[in-house]
Amino acid sequence: EGETYVSWYTFGDVYLSSVRTALDAAMEAKGLKVVDKDSNANQQTQTDDINTALVTGANAIVINLVESGAIGTAENLMNAVSAQNLPVVFFNRAVSTDNAEAEALFKGYDKSVFVGTDFTQAGIMQGKMIGEYVLEHFDELDLNHDGKISYVMFKGDEANQEAIARTKYGVECADEVLTAA
């Protein structure tokens, strides 16, 4: 009964398109009616859509926050959802750049949770994998045979705290592996 409302920061993100497909299938398999909304990378659109969902019968709210790392925005959305006594899940995009601040937000409402990765650890793992791969395949990767590997680093959305950390720690750890060799 009711709808699970899922607010996406954008439908244009390729990775999130695959997440959306899998999430919708999993929720529908549990008999949940899912309403997906595209915020088009606009926080005001997302906020307005969530407020509309709250007054039109949503029974749960799932949020892929447009403004990654914006604790004030996350607090406002949390307050709106908690005022309706509904469960809320924030996912994929950090609600704050400060872990203690984010933890306090979720401890303040017992029907809330954040689902995401340990992005520092993800970056470390990615960096180690890249470093080890380069060591094992150096001759293949040194295309101009100058003893250096040229690369281009693609990073996700500039505001996404997870993408920022994965890039930072990925490069640092790859460098550590290669420097140690």
Show the residue positions of the predicted features.
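A residue-level marker of the well-folded mature domains of exported/periplasmic proteins
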Residues: 1-181
